[in-house]
Amino acid sequence: MSNINKDALYDKVYGCWIGKSIGGTLGTPFEGRRELLDVTDFQTQSGRPLPNDDLDLQLIWLKALEDYGPLGVNEHVLGEYWINYIPPHWNEYGIGKSNMKTGLLPPLSGDFENGWKHSNGAWIRSEIWACCTPGCPEAATKYAWYDACVDHGTGEGTYAELFTASLESAAFVESDRDKLIQIGLSYIPGECRVAKSVQIALDGYKNGLDWKETRRRVLEDSADLGWFQAPANVAFVIIGWLYGEGDFKKSLLTAVSCGDDTDCTGATLGSILGIIYGAKALPADWKKHVGDEIITIAIDRGSWWNIPASCTDLTNRVMNMTPQVLASHNSGIGIGSGDTEPVNADNLAASHKYLNWLAEMNNSIQYDFIHSAVNIFYPEGVNISAGQEMPISITVYNKLPDPRHLEITYMLPDGFELIEGRKHLNLLHDTGVTSGKYEFTVRVRAGASVQAHNRGVMQMVAQGRPTVILAPILFLG
């Protein structure tokens, strides 16, 4: 088992939150300004931070971990916590919540008619997953998927959070900037727009361009996406990191001077460098400027009273949770008094198993029924008209070591007709020779009229098993 020194970890976790507070407070006054800026210092009075939803949402995710435990948190839990604890309806936040309220579960909640799914709302809240999985980026990235898909579906906003979460988790055990960026890139598709924008930033720096020209090239490539979008703003973080040349202040000032979603770029780069350097190494005057307090803006305080009041409080709560998360994921990482042991950067990159998992996530809805798991995917969407025939792709996974037969019943919406669909399947176990996975297609036809919400259920009964699979099906008229 690899060891991370407990005191060093505490300093890095605290550095993450203080760094985020510094960067968010530095960048917030310039948020939304798209022109090239010349930021030289804070615009606020010293002693308190500005509130920032980038941090607020992570306090809710910590509550979910504390309430449900490391293995109980998934996109369904986080979706329900969105509705209960996060009031704002800004951009993708509002669309994701509205879609869930109409019955669309994640990741459909983040995909359906969401013009903001490529935006910045997810990657700005990835640090909680990294801090709870230090040196274990694969686990961090799976949590990031559960998080991001709620309001970004399979958009670039989700890929952006996979990138930052993996990079930040790895930063607890690897401090080399270039290696960390490559680790982050390994967790997202090479052809996605986030990866392309990051590569433009890397190429500009490598080829000796100044940061302003590199920024211009990033903006030119992302012009079709518009403002407040993840690819360009993640690249601004990378520009600040590259051209800051190891200097905390210069790095954040450069990132914020790129403009656009400046509180997000400053806060995320501040947290990354806070993890790498630790809180003790951050500039004393900037730490003093923001203090230790957490001021919230996006949490329903009437529903939750035990909110961390300071970065110290937050760090202590994270430190209590982290050993549980690492153990739950069989990470092979322990936290103790000995020195932090070096880790080969190659071992931090995405595995083939992770990449296969990411491909299977796609935009299918996941259901876990203990002995089996079911994924439901609507290849032609969820909108349906009277008389229209629509396919549903079903994948069933065996989660236990025995094979089993499943009897399938379809309880369709009124007037709907089953055109195609298995009534029985033999779900084998995964032995290396046989696969514990079964895929099939269901086709339904709507009746002469449809309702606004057309709800059905696919029931699967496993012989000799008490748990009945009840997977909801929904079409919108």
Where are each of the predicted segments found?
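Short, surface-exposed loop/turn segments at beta-strand-coil junctions that are enriched for proline
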Residues: 428-430, 443-451
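A structural-propensity feature for long, helix-poor, extended segments
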Residues: 45-61, 67, 294-326
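Catalytic phosphate/nucleotide-handling subdomain of diverse soluble enzymes
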Residues: 22, 26, 37, 164, ...
